[in-house]
Regions:
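Juxtamembrane intracellular "pre-TM" segments in multi-pass secondary transporters
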Residues: 1-13, 195-226
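Substrate-agnostic recognition of the 12-TM MFS/MFS-like secondary transporter fold
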Residues: 14-32, 54-72, 76-92, 108-167, ...
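A single, central transmembrane helix in multi-pass transporters
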Residues: 17, 21, 25, 29-33, ...
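Extracellular/periplasmic helix-loop-helix junction of adjacent transmembrane segments
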Residues: 33-59
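Transmembrane alpha-helix termini and helix-breaking/packing motifs in multi-pass membrane transporters
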Residues: 35-41, 96, 100, 157-177, ...
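C-terminal transmembrane bundle of multi-pass solute transporters/carriers
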Residues: 63, 74, 80, 87, ...
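Helix-loop junctions on the cytosolic side of multi-pass membrane transporters
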Residues: 133, 181-203
């Protein structure tokens, strides 16, 4: 047990962890609410349109992240994170207000989703590079795994709670809760003590995107791991779309059952994260996890009813998150501090 939660003995990381848990809860509830808003309320079952909303949100990650990673190597990572979170909180507040006032339209969701994705593209590499500053190097694999445990612990509760709240109080109020969670996370970032960070010396030359590409080219192992992460992130993590369509159109279920699918996936994801926190990252774990993920996804596509599909979500969650955590830890512990931010 001490091994699993070793990084929580570091005060700065403990503050950060509590904030991410709060933010992740809000995000998972909001993702459930936004998917329901687009698929059921605004488009009356148009899954393709929901896919486009997700694509608009994800596109900045592909385009901007390499340059954002180089920026994170030169500037205060915490400042970038706080700024990005403020922008995302404003986006969430605007969308919540539009829904609660009844004037929301699909094009508005597209614009807000794009802005949110752009802010996330700056936040992601900054937080990847910030985590190594929160803990001693020996605790880094554990810290990365606990970050995933926070994310997937929120996945365990967030979607199910979000689905129930949609039925009880409506989509707009679920999004309003997300705004409160953003404010809480921003507050915890500001509480982290700068004099207790494990900062590394400045790089000998400015971090540039081409430096990161050149570094990765010299490391075939990183090419494999980053390719796995890219392929899964691009093609394998469309659960907000597939789960919503399967729950509502294939099985005729409501918002509660849709949210439950995310929570069941969270059970497997949480088990994967806690398991990764205890063991050393090895390539064989990536191979095993990919096999479990592939088989369970294939069986999910053939599921004859909601119950079977729901049970398989736990195996999908374990396989997907085990793959990504192990690959992530292997990357973070095998690169120099100045390349962490632009190899993600």
């Amino acid at each position: 047990m001490r091994t699993i939660f070793a990084s929580l003995t570091v005060p700065n990381y403990r503050i950060y962890f509590s904030g991410t848990l709060m933010a992740n809860m809000g995000q998972w509830m909001a993702r459930t609410a936004q998917s329901w808003l687009v698929l059921i309320i605004l488009t009356h079952g148009n899954a393709a349109m929901l896919g486009w909303v997700m694509a608009v949100n994800f596109a900045p990650l592909l385009v901007v992240t390499p340059w954002a990673g180089a920026l994170a190597d030169r500037m205060s990572k915490r400042r970038i994170m706080v700024t990005a979170q403020i922008v995302m909180a404003i986006d969430a507040a605007i969308l919540s207000t539009l829904v609660l006032t009844g004037i929301v339209q699909l094009w508005m969701v597209f614009v807000i989703s794009a802005m949110d994705g752009l802010a996330g593209a700056f936040y992601s590499p900054a937080t990847q590079a910030f985590v190594p500053e929160l803990v001693p190097l020996k605790n880094l694999p554990n810290a990365v795994s606990l970050n995933s445990a926070s994310f997937n612990g929120a996945r365990l509760l967030g979607p199910g709670l979000g689905g129930l709240l949609i039925a009880a109080v409506g989509v707009g109020w679920v999004m309003a809760i997300n705004v409160v969670c953003f404010i809480g996370f921003i507050s915890t970032l500001l509480l982290i003590k700068a004099d207790r960070l494990y900062t590394s010396p400045p790089a000998s030359e400015k971090a540039r995107v081409r430096d990161g590409i050149r570094y990765v080219k010299r490391r075939p192992d990183l090419v494999i791991l980053l390719t796995i992460g890219f392929m899964m992130g691009t093609f394998g993590f469309n659960f907000n779309i597939s789960d919503a369509v399967m729950a509502t159109q294939a099985f005729g279920k409501g918002s509660g059952e849709y949210g439950l699918l995310g929570s069941l996936m969270g059970i497997g994801s949480m088990a994967a994260a806690l398991g990764a926190a205890r063991r050393k990252p090895r390539l064989r774990w990536v191979e095993l996890a990919l096999l479990v993920y592939t088989i369970s996804m294939g069986l999910s596509a053939l599921a004859p009813n909601y119950g079977t599909f729901a049970v398989l979500k736990m195996f999908v969650g374990w396989g997907a998150i085990s793959t990504l955590i192990t690959a992530n830890v292997m990357v973070q512990t095998s690169v120099t501090p100045h390349t962490v931010s632009y190899t993600h």
